[in-house]
Design a protein with these regions (language model features):
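Generic detector of bulky aromatic hydrophobic side chains
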Residues: 1, 32, 48-49
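Short aromatic-glycine-(Arg/Gly/Cys) micro-motifs in beta-strand/loop hairpins
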Residues: 1-18
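Non-catalytic surface loops within mature trypsin-like serine protease
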Residues: 11-13, 26, 52
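Low-complexity, intrinsically disordered Gly/Pro/Thr-rich segments
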Residues: 28-36
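Short, mixed-charge low-complexity intrinsically disordered segments
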Residues: 36-52
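A short, exposed loop/beta-hairpin motif centered on an aromatic-Gly-Thr core
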Residues: 15-28
Length: 52
């Protein structure tokens, strides 16, 4: 059984808010993406789900 992780977040830009949904195979990748986004953008409403 291979787990996948769905990351949902709200991205705030100069043009407004955008809800983003991405799917990853590894939880470490989810954490890396969140760290990178947080360093360069404003994000909130972060939700991580395990999907199969």
């Amino acid at each position: 059984m291979n787990k996948k992780y769905r990351l949902t977040y709200t991205l705030h830009t100069e043009l407004g808010e955008r809800t983003c949904v991405e799917t990853f195979r590894y939880f470490e990748t989810v954490l890396q993406v969140l760290k990178n986004l947080n360093n360069h953008c404003e994000i909130d409403n972060i939700n991580i789900e395990v999907i199969e």
